[in-house]
Amino acid sequence: MQISITRLEKKLSQILPLAEAYQRSYNKLSEQYKSPEEMALYSRGYFLKKLWKMAQDSESAVAVLNIDGVPRGFVRYSAIPEYYTKPTDGQTRDLEKGMLDGWEFAWYRKVNFERDVQLTNKTLIVNQIYLDPHFQRHGLGTHLLQKTIPELKKLGYHDLIIEYNAHNKNAEKFYRGIGFRPFAKTQDFDHIIKKDGRTVFCISDVAIAHTTIDNALNSMRDKKLNNTFIMVQKRNGRAY
């Protein structure tokens, strides 16, 4: 198998297969701790719109993992939200509204967590990291981070944080294995879905973990891909 890493582009030929991989990965991770109402929202249309929006976001960097030329996973890095560097205030942040697959939805976060870690503008957040379940457990997720995090260091960034569902123990184990340590928790009022005159509240417990870039690189230093995979450089397109 051939592996390459490229930037996410606003092309359906790239986004369509990636949305399908994203959906399979998210459903596998979430089915045990998401409500049926919330899981029903995450159809392919949701992931298509989310990835299309990412491809247009000038303040994020999205690196796509391609296997035999087909997008199979990605990682997204962004500047940390402003409220991470402000005193705890309990105010609503990151409000988002819209129509999705015929449903009206809203998403918001109540910012009420303590900060034991000092965060600055040299900190990035790992917004998402997903890999098609068909290709998991081969070291590919770690490989994607190994190849992209050094580029962040070259740009002058020092720290990383990541958010994940607090009940997702597999995610926590993975992140701890690459140097992240939980330092805070909060809640997302993940979606408010209005359907048939009802409002359904889907609340998620969110864990937040931190590492320095140097610590992450040191933690991943000896981690290698399964020998099943053969590494090649990207021949066409822009490498990450």
PLM segments and residue spans:
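Conserved acyl-donor/pantetheine-binding loop and adjacent beta-alpha core of acyl/acetyltransferases
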Residues: 81-124, 190-194
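Conserved beta-strand-loop-alpha-helix junction that forms the acyl-donor binding cleft
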Residues: 127-136, 162-172, 188-195
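Conserved active-site alpha-helix within GNAT-family acetyltransferase domains
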Residues: 142, 154, 166-184, 189
